[in-house]
Amino acid sequence: MAHYHNDYKKNDEVEFVRTGYGKDMVKVLHIQRDGKYHSIKEVATSVQLTLSSKKDYLHGDNSDIIPTDTIKNTVHALAKFKGIKSIEAFAVNICQHFLSSFNHVIRTQVYVEEIPWKRLEKNGVKHVHAFIHTPTGTHFCEVEQLRSGPPVIHSGIKDLKVLKTTQSGFEGFIKDQFTTLPEVKDRCFAAQVYCKWRYHQCRDVDFEATWDTIRDVVLEKFAGPYDKGEYSPSVQKTLYDIQVVSLSQVPEIDDMEISLPNIHYFNIDMSKMGLINKEEVLLPLDNPYGKITGTVKRKLSSRL
């Protein structure tokens, strides 16, 4: 039978690397009413706090613990007091509240994602209080702030599915004894975009306009001109083009990470049915899938 040593306070064989606790997926719908014209923000927020002491871990002493239920209530109260102008501003408000209210909180991390509601509109007329859920990319942000420093803000896009039926190929790759993939000059190209960028300065930044700009760049570089498209020789090239254009158009951001899971669509062989299928009927395959990633940052000389 194993024997367990209970006097953990004398254990000098381990040390803390990082600690934190908090509340995940705190959901809020905030309604801004300007007469009969209403605006909404629905968000899911996760908060992590790091404390200056470790006595809760070492000794089970909870005297420094801010209950996670209190963290949840604080998120709700800040939505009431501050509103949600942007998810980035809301996350910064949460960080600064805990750092200013509790001297023993030394680090805050807040993740917020926005549920994609869009105001109903018809013939250029916007509805005053009705919205439709439009899953065309989720806006999220991550804000971290230490007691001794300013907030570090990342924003991003996820769950943005895109597909084009031509103007994509894949040729010239390495072939060995295990290669069965044929070269192709024309194929479907589909991906689920994950894109995250870091702001090097946040003063007077319009976070929502920046998000819209980068989302537009993603779509424009993926699709190309509306009348003819733009050829993509590889997922990697499209990924890099998105990053270069984004950093050139948005001077407030310093780096950008993109992940493009390559969603495969394969031509279905109908020859046994006596049919010729010329890339008209394709089979979507969820797994396995290719995953292409890349992170770029501004060169130091370009920041000066």
Swiss-Prot record:
Question: Modified residue N6-succinyllysine is at which positions?
Answer: 10, 23, 221, 228
Which residues are annotated with the PTM Phosphotyrosine?
Answer: 289
In the Enzyme Commission scheme, what number(s) does this protein have?
A: 1.7.3.3
Signal peptide positions are none
InterPro entries linked: Uricase (IPR002042), Uricase_CS (IPR019842)
Phosphoserine found at: 39, 63, 232
Listed A to Z, the keywords are: Acetylation, Oxidoreductase, Peroxisome, Phosphoprotein, Purine metabolism
Which residues hold urate?
68-69, 170, 187, 235-236, 262
- Catalytic reactions on record: urate + O2 + H2O = 5-hydroxyisourate + H2O2
GO BP: purine nucleobase catabolic process; urate catabolic process
Q: Which Pfam families match?
A: Uricase
Residue numbers of N6-acetyllysine PTMs = 10, 23, 27, 36, 118, 122, 164, 175, 185, 221, 228, 278
**Active site residues per record:** 23 (charge relay system), 68 (charge relay system), 264 (charge relay system)
Q: Does the keyword Iron apply?
A: no
In the record, N-acetylalanine modifications are located at: 2
Tell me where in or outside the cell this protein is found. Peroxisome
Q: Which family does it belong to?
A: Belongs to the uricase family.
Known function: Catalyzes the oxidation of uric acid to 5-hydroxyisourate, which is further processed to form (S)-allantoin.
Cross-referenced NCBIfam families:
urate_oxi
The identity of this protein, by name, is: Uricase
Gene source species? Aotus trivirgatus
